[in-house]
Amino acid sequence: MKESVAPSRDLTITALDYSSLAGWDDEGHGAAFRAFRRGASVLSRHPPKSHSVDAVALATILKRANALPADLPDNHARAFFEAEFAPYEIVSDGGTGFFTGYYEPIVAGSRIRTDRFATPLYRVPDDLVAFDPASPPPGLDPALRFARQTDKGPVAYFDRDEIEAGALAGRGLELVFVADPVDAFFMHIQGAARIDLAEGGTMRVSYAAKSGHAYTPIGRVLIEMGALEAGKATMDAIRQWLAANPDTAAVVMRQNRSFIFFREAPVENPQLGPIAAAKVPLADGRSLAVDRLLHTFHCPVWVETSLPDGKSFRRLMIAQDTGSAIVGPARGDIFFGSGAAAGTIAGSMASKGRFVLLAPRGSRPNVNPQR
């Protein structure tokens, strides 16, 4: 069955049969089911909101999943998904889906500033305020969602250059210290990290807020400088250049004015990643970041794409996270896990592919890219 539904000038949604999904029969549906089922634990506090699919129907399916064993065998999990959901391929602007990757860095650090660990990650300042971008305060850039509260009203918050020059010094906002400013910079990009503490133990930090300035990819900055070739500005290549050019690295990194503030999060299960925007822990190769304004958290998505080494990646994933760079109906960011090996894959991932949304049976997806 192939039936195009809800067409628009920029978007086509096509109903499919599961037989048209390459690799569906051989997929590890049990792992996908476990990732999906975790959404049931947050239903009462964070129910899904209707965007691309019927949130009420999705919540009902999550409750049914929660009544089943967590270790459901692959064949039973496959039967569950096929009975509860129908697949719809999303094609935007006449093109295919596009997939990148992200990961959780693991680095050494200390809660105490030392000669070795001197680069801080900051907690949220008390003068940072968030506001609705639809009604920004007068006089502020309408693109800003965060600002600094002053006696005269909100103003733009300090940017990366100002903060690294000491704008927040002396306020006791340092959450933890790491050794390498480049590591800290990439923690800002990933929005989370696991830190092996010099004084013993492990802590996890995750995104809490940001300065509000626009994000500038420094890969693009390095290409414009002629330091890297277009198409070769992978995360590994960027890190190598920054390490080889320490005198210029700080200047380049400060071109990204956006600055991230963190909170400490518990390491409840070292086999899982940090808590995602959907309030569930990320699962290696199963959690997908999507456009939160278009899609519904906890919805299954079938992904067909290729990895940086050319191997095919065909996986049933769950929409559990989001990101400021993840924009569009067929845009996905794959969580590859924690540590350096995951970072190598994530940093080179940039592939076209199929984005197939699984919608609750009896309802049709509604993805509106006109925002």
Regions found by a protein language model. Give the residues of each.
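C-terminal soluble interaction/assembly domains
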Residues: 2-7, 14, 25, 31, ...
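Secretory/export targeting leaders with adjacent low-complexity proregions
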Residues: 12-266
